[in-house]
A protein has these predicted regions:
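Acidic beta-to-alpha connecting loop that harbors the catalytic carboxylate
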Residues: 167-169
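Conserved alpha/beta-hydrolase
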Residues: 1-18
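Short alpha-helix in the alpha/beta-hydrolase fold that links the catalytic acid
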Residues: 159, 172-183
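Short beta-strand/loop motif that positions the catalytic acidic residue
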Residues: 157, 163-165
């Protein structure tokens, strides 16, 4: 069997502070500090013979930014897509575009964080995370257009990557997953249709 470690990024889940307003956090912090810190901790404390990474959505998107990515022996991603709004499913493309240009930035600045729970849409998101996400989603190549990131590390990520997309995922459409995951040089792509695996629906969040 395998030892498995899960964790929450700063500002969400069990890593959320009592007061989210005023918290300093960004998606790059999630990658360069939290995710990289987990990889270092696993190496130091568990010393595994091999380290495999499973990333959903943002987890698969940003793993290529790690300065210790060479420690990862293989990665499987699920619905790790470009968030660029024009690559979303036809039913929600315009809605996502409006949210990323107007609603999310406005609400985030108003509340000091993005109040997703009030809308029944999952976790509240720290201000810096929400604004960075919205900015990337307005850009044609998503985070790959952000020259303040260490983008050269994607080409240095040599571990094999198996990237899945899902037939009924309106966020992670096949072309959105292709657009993001093509940044990894050792990529294998696969697509799952829920009916083929005995499920009625999977979507983006399972």
């Amino acid at each position: 069997g395998y030892d498995v470690l899960t964790y929450d990024y700063r500002g969400v889940g069990s890593s959320r502070p009592e007061r989210l307003r005023g918290m300093e956090a960004s998606i790059r912090d999630w990658a360069l500090l939290d995710m990289a810190g987990v990889v270092d901790w696993v190496g130091a404390e568990l010393a595994p013979e091999r380290l495999f990474f499973v990333g959903h959505s943002v987890g698969g998107q940003v793993a290529g930014l790690l300065d210790n990515g060479a420690s990862i022996d293989g990665m499987i991603t699920m619905s790790a897509q470009s968030g660029y709004w024009r690559l979303q499913g036809a039913e929600q493309k315009l809605v996502v575009g409006f949210h990323m240009h107007v609603t999310f930035p406005m609400l985030t600045r108003l509340f000091g964080y993005l109040p997703m729970k009030r809308a029944g849409a999952g976790e509240d998101i720290p201000k810096g995370v929400a604004l960075e996400w919205a900015r990337w989603c307005r850009s044609r190549h998503y985070l790959l257009d952000d020259e303040t990131l260490p983008l050269e590390r994607y080409q240095q990520f040599q571990a094999p990557v198996l990237a899945y997309s899902v037939g009924d995922d309106k966020w992670g459409t096949p072309r959105a997953v292709d657009a993001m995951m093509s940044a990894y040089p050792n990529l294998q792509r696969s697509h799952i249709n829920p009916k083929e695996v005995g499920l009625d629906s999977i979507g983006h969040f399972g």
